[in-house]
Swiss-Prot record:
EC number: 1.17.4.1
Sequence similarity: Belongs to the ribonucleoside diphosphate reductase small chain family.
Annotated Fe cation 2 binding sites: 101, 163, 197, 200
Cofactor remark: Binds 2 iron ions per subunit.
GO biological process: deoxyribonucleotide biosynthetic process
InterPro entries: Ferritin-like_SF, RNR-like, RNR_small, RNR_small_AS, RNR_small_fam
Induction: Expressed early in the viral replicative cycle.
Co-factor requirement: Fe cation
The reaction(s) this protein catalyses: a 2'-deoxyribonucleoside 5'-diphosphate + [thioredoxin]-disulfide + H2O = a ribonucleoside 5'-diphosphate + [thioredoxin]-dithiol
One function term, GO molecular function aspect: ribonucleoside-diphosphate reductase activity, thioredoxin disulfide as acceptor
Key word Disulfide bond present: no
Record protein name field: Ribonucleoside-diphosphate reductase small chain
Subunit-structure text: Interacts with RNR1/OPG080 subunit. Can interact with host RNR1 supunit.
Length: 319
């Protein structure tokens, strides 16, 4: 039995802190709290109306995936992780993560509701995990792991792959729109959400390091390569990023690069041994995600929750 999963009679009380590294992650998550009302999407409609049909199609499908995916992550937290993990510090993080995932889901739903006026199309997008095969494939993979009989360690890797791999390509595509000066509300919310998800992925890696009996390297590699294949298909075949003017081969390589960063953070050898295909994408890769958070994306962080020097993070890099 893993110590972090063993029955803990002190789980109802926070102090004294036993796992300071896990507690520090919780405090970072707490400092990142934001709400959808703080994101101004009023200027997006003008840009939306200027987009090509291909660009609109791409953005709608990405938002449809995101709108459902956060609910899947939350179902896993509620049904499995929050019940299994017995240490208070991790439960604090997971509880806060659930609140943040709700905000993400609300944000994506609001964006769809704002951009798409036809009620039938809205319903189609809101029900993407049933109506869109390309989204359903990703959703089915994630949901499979909620109910899988595998141990906590394997499922921890699977959901690190969901948040670290399934999300990264879509984040990159929205950052590409920011580079073009489009959709300020969408792109600002993307900065906040990608920061949050980076922290969630970092937390999964931290929890993995607390396991005394982690899954084998072979098992970890299998889960991650499976996720990479699904995501590559999603963004280069089912919903090709060429629709918004990005290079599909570069996106494929980027997904492999992200996977290498993730497995390296977990303490294993890289799988693909590729370099980052673009300086632009360096800003949103997994490495340094916690630092990315600390630099206060969009100059946003709760005052006084964490003491940090002011840093200015720029995404204005040639792609």
């Amino acid at each position: 039995m893993e110590p972090i999963l063993a029955k803990n009679p002190n789980r109802f009380v926070i102090f004294p802190i036993q796992y300071h590294d896990i507690w520090n992650m919780y405090k970072k998550a707490e400092a990142s709290f934001w709400t959808v009302e703080e994101v101004d999407i009023s200027k997006d409609i003008n840009d939306w109306n200027k987009l090509t049909p291909d660009e609109k199609y791409f953005i709608k499908h990405v938002l449809a995936f995101f709108a459902a995916s956060d609910g899947i992550v939350n179902e896993n937290l509620a049904e499995r992780f929050c019940i299994e993990v017995q240490i208070t510090e991790a439960r604090c993080f997971y509880g806060f993560q659930m609140a943040i995932e709700n905000i993400h889901s609300e944000m994506y739903s609001l964006l769809i509701d704002t951009y798409v006026k036809d009620s039938n199309e809205k319903n189609y997008l809101f029900n993407a995990i049933e109506t869109m095969p390309c989204v359903k494939k990703k959703a089915d993979w994630a949901q499979k792991w909620i109910h899988d009989s595998a141990g906590y360690g394997e499922r921890l890797i699977a959901f690190a792959a969901v948040e670290g791999i399934f999300f990264s390509g879509s984040f990159a595509s929205i950052f590409w729109l920011k580079k073009r000066g489009l959709m300020p509300g969408l792109t600002f919310s993307n900065e906040l959400i990608s920061r949050d998800e980076g922290l969630h992925c970092d937390f999964a890696c931290l929890m993995f390091k607390h396991l005394l009996y982690p899954p084998s390297e072979e098992t970890v590699r299998s889960i991650i390569t499976d996720a990479v294949s699904i995501e590559q298909e999603f963004l280069t075949v089912a919903l090709p990023v060429k629709l918004i003017g990005m290079n599909c081969e570069m996106m494929k390589t980027y997904m492999e690069f992200v996977a290498d960063r993730l497995i390296s953070e977990l303490g294993f050898k890289r799988i693909y041994n590729v370099t980052n295909p673009s300086d632009f994408m360096e800003n949103i890769s997994l490495e340094g995600k916690t630092n990315f958070f600390e630099k206060r994306v969009g100059e946003y962080q709760k005052m006084g929750v964490m003491s940090q020097e002011d840093n200015h993070f720029s995404l204005d890099v040639d792609f």
